[in-house]
Amino acid sequence: MRIDIVTLFPELCDSFLSASILGRARAKNLFEAHCHQIRDYTKNKQKQTDDYPYGGGCGMVLYAQPIADCLRAVQAQCAAQGRAKPHVVFLTAAGRPYNEEKARELAGYDAVTLVCGHYEGIDQRVIDAFGDEEISIGDYVLTGGELASLVVADSVLRLQPGVLAEEKGYQDESYWDGLLEYPQFTRPEVWEGRAVPPVLLTGDHKKIDEWRGAQSRERTRERRPDLYDAWCESHPLTELPKWKRGENMRLVKNDEQLALCAALMAEGRRTVCAPVCSEEYLAKMTP
């Protein structure tokens, strides 16, 4: 994969991509990265890249011309390498929210170009002419798009084959399957009176996986109810193991109980079912 970052601060971006896990992967040519200075494509002697906005207002707006010429140069480089036309992403506060699903989508492209805004923003005409999409990494405003571009680059490049030691390294993490990651622990077993959960010391991988799954679901339910509700909808009762649904289906009395019991059997959320299902009923639901 090739990733290009169009920015006023290429040294900042390049240093990040040359450090730690990404730096080692880059040195092994597991991906190709280039950071481009917008000023190199200006046509004025002062190397000016911005001007006041039409219609008035505070701040300065980046010119369309140098960004457009830089993007054309990147397209030409990709074509010379036999690559597909790069997918162009503008990092803007007005973009669509970024998430793990989008990271996986971008990781599937052969070439991605990230354009960093600065000051008050970028002339919309170059976004309309070259942009495939606009992305925002959160509901807040930064002084420039460099940090946002590095967030996107990091989350995309780590998904490339060989960048992480094991594929499981990212498949078990938060958001990969729609849930937040379970808590992690390391040595010592007891730290300042706080012990590691006993199940993690048993060596029983089935029980450990069950504990981690329960912790992940509970953490998501408490901290990100939006993600949790979506997860429940994508994990209906019919997808559960037969031992969990064979007898249960016969006990369900109505559609409302069916929906509640689907969530119950998916993660053991008994409190949600309490208003509808008695304790005796719930006891029968769980083998």
Tell me what each language-model feature is.
Residues 147, 159-198:
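Internal, active-site/partner-interface "lid" segment
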Residues 252, 269-287:
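Conserved GNAT-fold acetyl-CoA-binding loop/helix
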Residues 248-265, 272-274:
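A short beta-loop-alpha structural element at the N-terminal edge
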Residues 122, 126-173:
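Structured adenosyl-cofactor binding patch, chiefly the S-adenosyl-L-methionine
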Residues 63-118:
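S-adenosyl-L-methionine/SAH cofactor-binding core of RNA-modifying enzymes
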Residues 184, 188-249, 262:
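SAM-dependent methyltransferases
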Residues 4-6, 34-36, 89, 112-113, ...:
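Hydrophobic/aromatic beta-strand patches that form the interior of the parallel beta-sheet core
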Residues 1-80, 205-229:
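N-terminal nucleotide/polyanion-binding subdomain common to many enzyme families
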